[in-house]
A protein has these predicted regions:
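Mobile-element integrase/transposase regions
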Residues: 1-31, 37, 49-53, 61-62, ...
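Basic, flexible linker segments flanking DNA-binding modules
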Residues: 1-9, 75-76, 82-100, 175-180
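C-terminal domain-tail junction helix/linker
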Residues: 6-7, 90, 105-107, 116, ...
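Mobile genetic element proteins and their domesticated derivatives, centered on retroelements
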Residues: 12, 30, 36, 55, ...
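A short acidic/small-residue loop/turn micro-motif
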Residues: 44-48
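Acidic/histidine-rich, metal-coordinating catalytic segments
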Residues: 64-90, 113-115, 120, 168-170
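Histidine/acidic-residue-rich catalytic or RNA/ligand-binding cores of hydrolases
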Residues: 122-125
Length: 187
């Protein structure tokens, strides 16, 4: 079956290797599984607040309705397995701030099975690309330097031809669906 760009967005967090000016940072990644279009952001913390902040930014940049997201079971995305108020009946999910945000915005929040990162394979593969082609090739003088270089890397990635897209770039794929305006294609 043909995939459509608004169907599923995989979201994950990657530790930025090493330190930048003595600080640790976290890269949030959202990738559309149909178009491979990505949005990246770096924060100094990984928290529920940052997860929602990042999803809001993704929703703003994509300019189309995200139907569903898929995340791992980290406490920044769910408290299904970690909540202090966990019920003995695991069919009843405890409410997490991200789940509430998704519900308010009519977004389905899927969770991968515990210990099965391959179920979030599109975002995991993109993190490998980030490691090999971005982090191992760059150094960062400051948080601002990291942000600028990461934004450039994101623009490059979204304009890179992908075999899985029959040689199209993620931006070209989305333009064919007329889901984003050309002025928003670069980021």
């Amino acid at each position: 079956a043909e995939r459509h760009p608004d169907e599923l967005m995989e979201i994950d967090v990657k530790y930025v290797p090493g330190t930048v000016a003595g600080m640790k940072y976290f890269q949030y990644t959202a990738i559309d599984t149909a178009s491979r279009w990505r949005r990246l952001a770096v924060y100094d913390e990984q928290t529920n607040f940052h997860s929602i902040l990042f999803l809001k930014e993704v929703m703003e940049k994509f300019k189309y309705k995200i139907q569903a997201i898929k995340t791992d079971n980290g406490s920044i995305f769910t408290n299904y397995y970690t909540s202090m108020t966990k019920r003995s009946d695991m069919t009843v999910k405890t409410i997490h701030a991200l789940d509430l945000f998704c519900k308010e915005n009519n977004i389905i929040h899927y969770l991968i099975d515990p210990g099965k990162p391959a179920q979030n394979g599109t975002v995991e593969r993109s993190h490998r690309e980030d490691q090999e082609k971005f982090y191992e090739q760059n150094t960062f003088k400051s948080f601002s330097d990291l942000q600028i270089k990461l934004e450039r890397w994101n623009i490059y990635y979204n304009n890179l031809e992908h075999c899985g897209l029959n040689g199209k770039t993620p931006n070209e794929f989305l333009l064919n669906y007329k889901l984003i305006k050309p002025t928003n294609v670069c980021a």
